[in-house]
A protein has these predicted regions:
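Substrate-recognition element of Asp-dependent hydrolases with the DxDx(T/V) motif
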Residues: 30, 92-121, 134
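N-terminal helical cap/lid subdomain that shapes the substrate entry/recognition surface
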Residues: 4-93, 102
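Short active-site oxyanion
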Residues: 103-107, 128-130, 148-150, 168-170, ...
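Acidic, Mg2+-coordinating phosphoryl-transfer loop and its flanking beta/alpha structural elements
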Residues: 110, 153-196
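A short, structured active-site edge motif that brings together acidic residues
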Residues: 45-47, 126-140
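Short loop-to-alpha-helix "cap/lid" segments that border enzyme active sites
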Residues: 135-147, 157, 161
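Non-catalytic pre-domain segments flanking phosphatase-related domains
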Residues: 1-13, 200-223
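Surface-exposed amphipathic alpha-helices with a cationic face
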Residues: 93-101, 145, 160-167
Length: 223
C-alpha cells in the first residue's frame, strides 16, 4: 500500500492573479481614479505589478501626504469599476473543490482590502471557508498560522515569503507578475503553470508521489 502525505488542515490561496485576473477591473478603477483626481496614472503599467499593497502603487503617482486619502477614494470606487470586470482564472474553482474533496479547508489570504476581496469572491461564486484581507508578504503568516494552513498558493514572490514565514509549503503559480525562475529563486517549493495543475499536484502530494519529472512541476529544496 502506497504511503500517504496527510493533507494540511487548511490550504491558503492568494487572490489577485492567483484565483482572479483582476487586471481589467483594476485598470478600469485606476482610469476612473485618474479622471476623478486629475492626476495621470498609467493604468496599463500599474496592472503589470499587482501584488504589493495599494499604497506601494499609489506612491508612484501621488505625493506621500495624499496616499491615505487617495487610497480611501480608490477603495470606495472599486466595487463600481472592478468587480464585474474581473474573471476567475482557469482552475480557480476546481482548485478550491479539490481541497474540499480531499477533506481540507480553503482560505483566501490577500493584500486586497478585505470587503472588496469578499465582493470578488461572491460575484464569481467562489466560496472559501474564510477570507482574510489587508495582509502582504510576511504579514500573511499570522493568518496562515491562525487557520492552520500547511500550504499557501500564490503568484508573487511576496506570497512565497509569506508561506515560508508561516512554515507552510509554498506552491506558486506563474499567472502573475513573477516568472517561474523568480518564484523558484524566492524559495517556492513547487511551481505550477496555473491552477489547472493544482488538483493533480494535490493528489500526488497527498499520496506521497514525486512530481519532479511531471511537466509543470518544479519542486525546490527548502532551505
Amino acid at each position: 500500500m502506497a504511503s500517504t502525505t496527510a493533507l494540511p488542515p487548511t490550504v491558503g490561496f492568494d487572490l489577485d492573479m492567483t484565483l482572479i485576473d483582476s487586471r481589467p477591473g483594476i485598470r478600469a478603477c485606476y482610469q476612473a481614479l485618474s479622471e476623478r483626481t486629475g492626476t495621470h496614472i498609467d493604468a496599463d503599467l500599474a496592472v503589470t505589478r499587482l501584488g504589493p499593497p495599494l499604497a506601494d502603487e499609489l506612491i508612484n503617482w501621488f505625493p506621500a501626504e495624499r496616499i491615505d486619502e487617495v487610497a480611501d477614494l480608490y477603495r470606495a470606487m472599486y466595487p463600481a469599476y472592478a468587480i464585474a470586470a474581473t474573471p476567475a482564472l482557469p482552475g480557480a474553482r476546481e482548485a478550491m473543490s479539490a481541497v474540499r474533496e480531499a477533506g481540507g479547508r480553503a482560505v483566501v489570504v490577500t493584500a486586497k482590502h478585505e470587503p472588496n476581496a469578499r465582493l470578488h469572491l461572491a460575484h464569481l461564486g467562489i466560496e472559501p471557508d474564510a477570507v482574510i484581507g489587508d495582509l502582504w508578504a510576511e504579514q500573511k503568516a499570522s493568518a496562515l498560522r491562525e487557520h492552520g494552513a500547511g500550504v499557501y498558493v500564490g503568484d508573487h514572490v511576496g506570497d512565497v515569503r509569506g508561506a515560508r514565514a508561516a512554515d507552510a509549503l509554498s506552491v506558486a503559480v506563474a499567472t502573475g507578475p513573477c516568472d517561474p525562475a523568480e518564484l523558484r529563486e524566492a524559495g517556492a517549493d513547487v511551481v505550477l503553470t496555473d491552477l489547472t495543475e493544482f488538483p493533480g499536484w494535490l493528489s500526488d502530494h497527498m499520496n506521497g508521489r514525486d512530481n519532479g519529472g511531471r511537466p509543470g512541476y518544479s519542486p525546490a529544496a527548502r532551505a
